[in-house]
């Protein structure tokens, strides 16, 4: 098609030249819209009604939104005309209130329909969602036989997926406390698993050499030469969050994030301020933050700075501007570490609703939805179970896997499989098959091949839980991106293959083609771990004491001093911030160690919530606390106050709160936004919690403001400014 004619009729992508919609600025097209709309509707009915799967054809991706926009336009006109006619009748009958009510409802309905007629993409989404509502998600049965690999394996050792399992790492009984509590997970056992998979992935003999190998190989492939990490280079760690902590909805395990930071900061000596831990679609990171921040205070937690527009291009269907934006942490990173969960995203149902979920699984692929500015426009393309899709159809996850700033910038793929999530917002389930034997999965996986690790995660979940139909469609597309079953010309097609996909031989032996020596597919390598090795089962501090428990140790030391008991409670009597290091020893050598930092703070100023200036949805309760009582998307509120600081320097903001609505707030200091993550965990029975956040304050008067956008919050009692006692 002639370029000028194409641009006259259509809206095109400025980079690829692809048609992405109608040119709404064209005056002639605006005038002739009813004719074009009617033609599009007729074309849609003729083509799609006899064969619904045709809705995914490129021509229908353009025609359908125009057709339904036309329907919305006509409906808007008719509703508007009918409303006005009814209003005049009531007004002349002197039924003023009834007439005004009819007019208001009519304007609202007509306006909504008009907006949908103008926004083709919105109309398309609504129609497709309504078509899927109430339909059967089907059940997944692989179309490819076991051990028939497709695609080209990637990695230092192609196709290798390292797997570590230690049943004692996840020690939660499923009832007491939270899965994320420090006494429910062994930090040192998690450390051993994390170290084991990284070493096994590279076949090095020490963890520092293993990370060096990862950095050198990555940089060589990026054209930088086989060089190590250089001080100042930025690392983005994308974790998976759906909750804000304080509940048993499974998110990134705090102990897992701690272990990764321990390797990067303590072993590889990477500056803390060069690391960002984030999920840009979930502002709350409190459970992870509360556990990790005292030891690694200078890491950037969720301060990702918003999104960079027009970074991502999609190969089909998706044109939304927000969906094309990328989290700044990912955009600016020299290295991405994709740290996902082992999660079934949707529980298959024969009557689908949006709350059931969109895709079959969430692992390293869908994890990156948390790096995208606007996610809902992506949902249609990942419903591979839909009657309008199926195997051999476009899936936007493939575009993210191939993107130079996302999959193309990933140093290593990790899967935190301490607890498996049966649904996108679900609680942990136990696995029945050996070696789990009705226990938690309590595992870690690592790979340089994203398709391979996704395939392994899918096989693990499918062996225990049913999945919705066509669960591995995106893996078939990714493995064959150069010539995919869908025929889509993916933007990353020049890569040929994004990795290797296959299914294991059976859920008992879990053997892939490289394990069997029958092909060049996946190798699942299990890291050998002795459950009876010396370990610290837990080590944590509360306000008054240190709590610890060790196992299989010949000797236990705290800050170099021998302890007589393998477990115990040690009263705290300290006046300043203190580091505590617990070690287990065997044959005179340290076998495991864990560090805990206990802060001591001195209050500089105390501000009662009742004395703060309140705006919007901020309400004062009878007990003197302030609570934001707006609904999602409907209101905003804030509290502000002033503090007088004696000296310029580093301080801590200490928020005392209570309640079961753990939604974080924005923090502004002297008009400048400092954080979008003043977070709160859920508390119960009136128990109060504290959130501690480091802030830099100027000498003299500083104005602080907590802003809460549009959702209910916990109750805030006091906000103190404190100085650390060192």
How should each PLM-predicted stretch be described?
Residues 38-80:
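Membrane-embedded alpha-helical segments of integral membrane proteins
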Residues 93-116:
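Internal/C-terminal transmembrane anchor helices
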Residues 560-566:
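Short beta-strand segments within Ig-like beta-sandwich modules, predominantly Fibronectin type-III
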Residues 568-580:
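Solvent-exposed segments in extracellular or luminal domains encompassing
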Residues 601-726:
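Extracytoplasmic
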